[in-house]
């Protein structure tokens, strides 16, 4: 079975590894190298790093739809499938029509819910109790193709986007193999998607500023959903305090939302519109993330300050 693989971030790496193990991967497409870090050195994508270990031809089109030479090369390869995992470019009908059986995309949501760029973040921000992966036969729409298989996982009360990402990253590779086998053997008939959806738009940093006039649970979900990026924050005495870990306490407070009502080694209690939020791990400017117990060992957090 000849496979062309298209993907870019670390989420796609286990799927690429599995494709290399099970099939004949004839080409890898990934996004161009990008400047990274303070030194702005050019960095390879995670998929390129993995592909180089296996001496598979790697192509990095700026825009695949405009790269005639590469499109012709893909046609010459005559792949049975093109497998797409977080590639970062939309495929034209011309490219979608190249493989014998079609293009399969692994998407990290239970479609049709959470189409779009940030499905894991939004599922947690919205307080969903489950998420998962869906494989689909791609069409020209954005995450609208006919569904092949789904794999559902529980979102536990304190799970972060990073933790959910790492679970689905590994499980997605298995789902792709089952999908490839099912489609190529004719054992699976893809199913059309319904219209009910929540569009998981790309995150921007503005969402990270905590509104204390929300319930403790809503804020807890925001903190989980924005970890590991961009990290929810609030202002403490004109200093930005990034918040990495919280817990909802079913307690009442008559203080204004955002007021620090108690500080102990267990955490910082903050009044919310509903219930109380316990802040357990924070980061201040020029510091590293610390538990509250670690932080108050050398610094003070005052009660009755209102977080902004």
From Swiss-Prot:
GO terms for cellular component: cytosol. It catalyses: L-methionyl-tRNA(fMet) + (6R)-10-formyltetrahydrofolate = N-formyl-L-methionyl-tRNA(fMet) + (6S)-5,6,7,8-tetrahydrofolate + H(+). (6S)-5,6,7,8-tetrahydrofolate binds at residues 109-112. It holds the Pfam family Formyl_trans_C. Keywords: Protein biosynthesis, Transferase. HAMAP family: Formyl_trans. The lineage of its organism: Bacteria, Bacillati, Bacillota, Clostridia, Eubacteriales. InterPro entries: Fmt, Formyl_trans_C, Formyl_trans_C_sf, Formyl_transf_N, Formyl_transf_N_sf, Formyl_transferase-like_C_sf, GART_AS, Met-tRNA-FMT_C. Belongs to the Fmt family. It comes from Clostridium beijerinckii (strain ATCC 51743 / NCIMB 8052) (Clostridium acetobutylicum). Its EC number is 2.1.2.9. This is Methionyl-tRNA formyltransferase. The keyword Metal-binding does not apply. GO terms for molecular function: methionyl-tRNA formyltransferase activity. Attaches a formyl group to the free amino group of methionyl-tRNA(fMet). The formyl group appears to play a dual role in the initiator identity of N-formylmethionyl-tRNA by promoting its recognition by IF2 and preventing the misappropriation of this tRNA by the elongation apparatus.
């Amino acid at each position: 079975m000849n496979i062309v693989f298209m993907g870019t971030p670390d989420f796609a790496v286990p799927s690429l590894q599995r494709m290399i193990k099970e099939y004949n991967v004839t080409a890898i497409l990934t996004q161009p190298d990008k400047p990274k870090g303070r030194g702005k050195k050019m960095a390879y994508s995670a998929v390129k790093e993995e592909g180089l270990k296996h001496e598979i031809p790697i192509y990095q089109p700026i825009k695949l739809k405009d790269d005639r030479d590469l499109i012709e090369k893909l046609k010459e390869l005559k792949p049975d499938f093109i497998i797409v995992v977080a590639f970062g470019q939309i495929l034209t009908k011309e490219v979608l029509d190249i493989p014998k059986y079609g293009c399969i995309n692994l998407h990290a949501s239970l479609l049709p819910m959470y189409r779009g760029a940030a499905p894991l973040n939004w599922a947690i921000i919205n307080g969903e109790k489950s998420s998962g992966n869906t494989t689909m036969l791609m069409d020209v729409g954005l995450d609208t193709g006919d569904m092949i298989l789904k794999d559902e996982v529980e979102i536990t009360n304190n799970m972060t986007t990073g933790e959910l990402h790492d679970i689905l990253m590994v499980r997605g590779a298995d789902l792709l193999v089952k999908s490839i086998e099912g489609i190529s053997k004719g054992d699976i008939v893809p199913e059309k998607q319904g219209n009910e959806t929540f569009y998981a738009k790309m995150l921007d940093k503005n969402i990270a500023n905590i509104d204390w006039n929300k319930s403790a649970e809503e804020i807890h979900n925001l903190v989980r959903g924005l970890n590991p990026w961009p990290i929810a924050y609030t202002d403490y005495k004109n200093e930005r305090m990034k918040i990495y870990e919280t817990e909802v306490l079913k307690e009442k407070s008559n203080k204004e939302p955002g007021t620090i009502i108690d500080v102990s080694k267990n955490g910082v209690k903050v009044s919310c519109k509903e219930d109380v939020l316990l802040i357990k791990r924070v980061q201040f400017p020029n510091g590293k993330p610390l538990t509250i117990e670690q932080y108050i060992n050398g610094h003070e957090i005052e009660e009755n300050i209102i977080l902004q």
